[in-house]
């Protein structure tokens, strides 16, 4: 295959993959996108069913996506680097644009929590680090720092303001 880099993560990875392609020295050929909306690529991550069914629908398969991507990575040549991009804040603290879900984790590892706690954040960080280090044993891993949270849907808000002439 002609793959040069794999971008993996949630919708934030999907939003940034074109920038990664643009950064390629010889054009965008070979940039592969493995993304699943609302699904942070973190080893051992489990989604809280009721919350994710409400947000994504009943056929949401985040854990299966993560397992698929991990399996695929083991079968690919080690010279293909991976770029991990996730909206970690939403997974750990809930969607800040949905006021009822603030400080309610959308994911868990060992036990489901109704509030974000320091213990949960430590476990969250441990899984991010362990997963990246495990991948780095076999290939180069790049992790994109968190994208700033705005607390509202920026494209929707700006388009409405533009339509109303308030922008």
Predicted regions and their residues:
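Extracellular glycan-modifying ectodomains
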Residues: 1-167
